[in-house]
Swiss-Prot record:
PROSITE patterns: EF_HAND_1, EF_HAND_2, FAD_FR. Residues 276-311 form the EF-hand domain. This is Respiratory burst oxidase homolog protein A. Residues 13-36 have a biased composition (Polar residues). Its main location: membrane. Phosphorylated by CPK. Ca(2+) binds at residues 289, 291, 293, 295, 300. The gene is RBOHA. It comes from Solanum tuberosum (Potato). The chain crosses the membrane at residues 400-420, 436-456, 483-503, 536-556, 584-604, 760-780. It comes from the Eukaryota.
Length: 963
């Protein structure tokens, strides 16, 4: 019989009068034919789970009332479509002493079956009854003797009273649980198990051929030594685990060796890659069962937990191995025999999903993907190209019109100068080389002015809040800055190249007649030599600019700024943020020299024709004004450090007082300077406090020399942790050592500050990249609490019949403007995905995660933590970690990895499934995807946004943080 997913059907045993009855055998020791003896006999209620694949799982057997199929005699019970419920008087009379199941009324049973049973239940009942009778008959025969002396009810009674045969009762109880576990293992659960306990990940090795090649490299005298086993099978990162695996496989063969032959290696490999779940389970059991007695004690469980924790780089879990070993024993050994067996370990592995129910909202299946992507008909190549073109225009129209306008301006300036110099007499000698050089020079003047505008951060921050943000992509200001820099490099090559290798040689080699006729008014009566042109004001200033810009542009590239290129000392100082920061200040000299260069021109003599200063005047003044504003504002924003903490992963948290005039939005950042480290360097950091907080906070991870020195300075000011407290270095206002002075400047706009525009948020942070979104989560949480308070206020007001009370509450309601209500209700859901490599990283924002879990009763915010140091679910190295995680959360409500109520997932997220889930849950919504982290994931997320935007009406808009 096919049942509805997620529902259960309940059947009870009955007298077996004919094969037409859907019944199970009565409990051992009862007379199935004696209906009048219900008061003295014990019947069971069998709870079955009917799966979609027509398999049946026996969940429990409890005392219950009697139900018959195909027996609708009014004299004996009430029938429902072939199902009758008998309620003997004897059972009714004893209901007061029976369990809650026994006290269920007939009306409750009628309601339950009317809701759960479908028409197909009656049609398939006869067939199912035969299978169930046979299964229960086998169950009764196999445990008849044990059940006569030990019933489920009598076991617990004996346990309380403490009579006699405690060990026998415990063994009988375990035997009963084992029988149930065997019935519970169906085809569906076995199929799920095939995905678990994999010793070799598919992406780690390409099968036996690669292992064979590794053997050839590592073998000595034709044997592979135990110490090289991990590297040979592709488990180099989990050497301890691999060595235990080697020992377990050797023990099964009664071998105690330190080396194996190629043939033995092949046998080992065949076993650990066996597709049979039972085979893999036995190997895992053997790894734990080191004394080979077929039983696992608590100490052995502790050892394998420590081994798994070490393989997954979970140092804290290793420290708490004893506690979690006791937790597993408590769950699997309720009889307290002191050991567990293979079948109990199997039960825990197969039923771990039951304990993970708390995270079902976090682990969405791929069904959503199939629902959204199935049925998409294949389109012709022309149709696909046109769709992509339309989408690209819709997605990038802001960038396109800005770039097109910029390119058209450069083309116009180039052509204007090109034709202007074509009319000059110098063209007759220098030719088109002169025209190209002058056209490029005009674009250089324009771009040298334009490149300053995207880095006028205060101006950009202001413009973000205006209507202009609807037409100009201010989020791409840094990218546009880099694009203009590339155009400047191109212009320099054209301008300087044509002068040095083309028109200068033509000038010095021109015959005297042409020189006197066309160039004497520009270069004087004496024809210059090449060195005269180079050492002149124009030549010297040009060379100086080229050298300084080459240095600044080179050190600003990603390879140098991110220290991707390694140099030996002392040249290592040429890489990193400091090299970028200081080299960029060379451009101040470049602009001064550029004005001089544009004043002393060979072919232009009228001052109003020398336009370089005209291009630069406004941008240079604007940028200089911003730098001046930063200087004075940093002195105006006096802050007092309130709290300092240094977390695992070399993360420094600074909490400081909030200046009264410092107003910011969630997602924005500010610049920080510490004179004790450097009196000149300013570094940007995302603000992690919410706008409503009465303090400012930032989280700084040690990545470069400045952050390293900053951490050292504050570490010296921090106090050592007291005994019994967390091992964090902390300092506050009461610390005896004075804290270093800190200067701030900002706030400055960032893409994440526009999160309120979207119906749904998808926030993705890698490591310290989570910082821009912590402030957003805090702000959302505050809005949630405010919204609930407003709803309660409105509810109290509407339900209050007292006019005086209503009058007193009316002003409070009037304060809630429609505009404010609309802004708080705009974002309906937020999904935060935090991916990190280290377990200690979760301490950074532990308080925020607990606060969200406690206050977000409506489930507006979903938090997803991913720890990439742990092997993915299904890997044998993380199997026990997953079990402990599930058990501990089911019992205590706390995740063992993060220390919060938010479950930690292992390995990396499947981003396609994440997008599919979000698409399914929020059809026709505008979803903002905000990302902060490594560029490689940004490309994947951007690509997925484009892909899913072409599938339906839901729109994903991707934004990446730039500093």
């Amino acid at each position: 019989m096919r049942g509805l997913p997620g529902h259960e059907r309940r059947w009870t045993s009955d007298t077996v009068s004919s094969g037409k009855d859907l019944s199970g055998e009565s409990s051992p020791g009862t007379d199935s034919g004696n209906i009048s003896g219900f008061a003295s006999e014990e019947f069971v209620e069998v709870i079955l789970d009917l799966q979609d694949d027509d398999t049946i799982i026996l969940r429990s057997v409890e005392p219950a009332t009697v139900i018959n199929i195909d027996a609708s005699d009014p004299a004996t019970g009430v029938g429902i479509g072939g199902v009758s419920i008998e309620t003997p008087a004897s059972l009714t009379s004893t209901s007061g002493t029976r369990s809650p199941t026994m006290r269920r009324s007939t009306s409750n049973k009628l309601r339950q079956f009317s809701q759960e049973l479908k028409a197909e239940a009656v049609a398939k009942a006869k067939h199912f009854s035969q299978e169930l009778k046979a299964e229960l008959r086998r169950f009764s025969w196999s445990h008849g003797h044990a059940s006569r002396t030990f019933s489920p009810a009598s076991f617990f009674q004996n346990a309380v009273v403490g009579t006699g045969n405690g060990v026998d009762s415990a063994l009988a109880a375990r035997a009963l649980r084992r029988q149930r576990a065997q019935l519970d293992r169906t085809r569906s659960s076995a199929h799920k198990a095939l995905r678990g306990l994999k010793f070799i990940s598919n992406n780690k090795t390409n099968g036996w051929n690669e292992v064979e090649n590794n053997f050839a490299k590592l073998a000595k005298d034709g044997y592979l030594y135990r110490s090289d086993f991990a590297q040979c099978i592709g488990m180099k990162d989990s050497k301890e685990f691999a060595l235990e695996l080697f020992d377990a496989l050797s023990r099964r063969r009664r071998l105690k060796v330190d080396k194996i032959s190629k043939e033995e290696l092949y046998e080992y490999w065949s076993q650990i890659t066996d597709q049979s779940f039972d085979s893999r389970l036995q190997i895992f059991f053997d790894m734990v069962d080191k004394n080979e007695d077929g039983r696992i004690g608590e100490e052995e469980v502790k050892e394998i937990i420590m081994l798994s924790a070490s393989a997954n780089k979970l140092s804290r879990l290793k420290e708490q191995a004893e506690e979690y070993a006791a937790l597993i024993m408590e769950e699997l050994d309720p009889e307290r025999l002191g050991y567990i067996e293979l079948w109990q370990l199997e039960t825990l592995l197969l039923q771990k999903d039951t304990y993970l129910n708390y995270s079902q909202a976090l682990s969405y299946t791929s069904q959503a993907l199939s629902q959204n992507l199935q049925g998409l008909r294949k389109r012709s190549p022309i149709r696909r190209m046109s769709t992509k073109l339309v989408y690209s225009l819709q997605e990038n129209w802001k960038r396109i019109w800005v770039l097109v306008l910029w390119i058209l301006i450069m083309i116009g300036l180039f052509l204007w100068k090109f034709y202007l110099y074509k009319q000059k007499s110098a063209f007759q000698v220098m030719g088109y080389c002169l025209l190209t050089a002058k056209g490029a020079a005009e674009t250089l003047k324009f771009n040298m002015a334009l490149i300053l505008l995207p880095v006028c951060r205060n101006t950009i921050t202001f413009l973000r809040s205006t209507k202009l943000s609807c037409f100009v992509p201010f989020d791409d200001n840094i990218n546009f800055h880099k694009t203009v820099a590339a155009a400047i490099v191109t212009g320099i090559i054209l301008h300087a190249g044509n002068h040095l290798v083309c028109d200068f040689p033509k000038l010095i080699h021109a015959n005297n007649t042409n020189y006197q006729k066309y160039l004497v008014n520009d270069f004087g009566p004496s024809q210059p030599q090449y060195i005269d042109l180079v050492k002149g004001v124009e030549g010297v200033t040009g060379i100086i600019m080229v050298i300084l810009m080459a240095i600044a542009f080179t050190l600003a590239t990603r390879w140098f700024r991110r220290s991707l290129i390694k140099f030996p000392k002392p040249f290592d100082r040429l890489t990193g943020f400091n090299a970028f920061w200081y080299s960029h200040h060379l451009l101040i000299i470049v602009y001064i020299v550029l004005i001089i260069h544009g004043t002393f021109l060979y072919l232009v003599h009228n001052w109003y024709s020398k336009t370089t200063w005209m291009y630069l005047a406004v941008p240079v003044l604007l940028y200089a004004g911003e730098r001046t504003l930063r200087f004075f504002r940093s002195g105006l924003y006096t802050v007092r450090l309130l709290k300092v903490a240094i977390y695992p992963g070399n993360v420094l948290t600074l909490q400081m007082s909030k200046p009264p005039q410092f107003r910011y939005k969630s997602g924005q950042y500010m610049f920080v300077q510490c004179p004790a480290v450097s009196p000149f360097e300013w570094h940007p950091f995302s603000i992690t406090s919410a706008p409503g907080d009465d303090y400012l906070s930032i989280h700084i991870r040690q990545l470069g020399d400045w952050t390293q020195e900053l951490k050292r300075v504050f570490s010296e000011a921090c106090e050592q942790p007291e005994a019994g407290k967390s091992g964090l270095l902390r300092a506050d206002e009461n610390t005896k050592t004075s804290l270093p002075k800190l200067l701030i400047d900002g706030p400055y706009g960032a893409p994440a500050q526009d999160y309120r525009k979207y119906d749904v948020l998808l926030l993705v942070g890698l490591g310290i990249g989570a910082t821009p979104f912590i402030s957003i989560l805090k702000d959302l949480l505050k809005n949630i609490v405010t919204m609930e308070e407003q709803a309660d206020l409105v509810s109290d007001f509407s339900g209050n019949s007292d006019m005086s009370a209503a009058t007193s509450e009316q002003p409070a309601l009037n304060k809630i403007s429609p505009k404010k209500r609309k802004s708080t209700l705009k974002t309906t859901n937020a999904y935060f995905y935090w991916v990190t490599r280290e377990q200690g990283s979760f301490d950074w924002f532990k308080g925020v995660m607990n606060e969200v879990a406690e206050l977000d009763q409506r489930g507006v915010i979903e938090m997803h933590n991913y720890l990439t140091s742990v092997y993915e679910e299904g890997d044998a190295r993380s199997a026990l970690i997953t079990m402990v995680q599930a058990l501990n959360h089911a019992k205590n409500g706390v995740d063992i990895v993060s220390g919060t109520s938010v479950r930690t997932h292992f390995a990396r997220p499947n981003w396609r499934k994440v997008f599919s889930k979000t698409l399914t849950k929020h059809a026709n919504a505008r979803i903002g995807v905000f990302y902060c982290g490594a560029p490689i994931l940004a490309k994947e997320l951007s690509k997925l946004c484009k892909e899913f935007n072409q599938k339906g009406t839901t729109k994903f808009e991707f934004h990446k943080e730039h500093f």
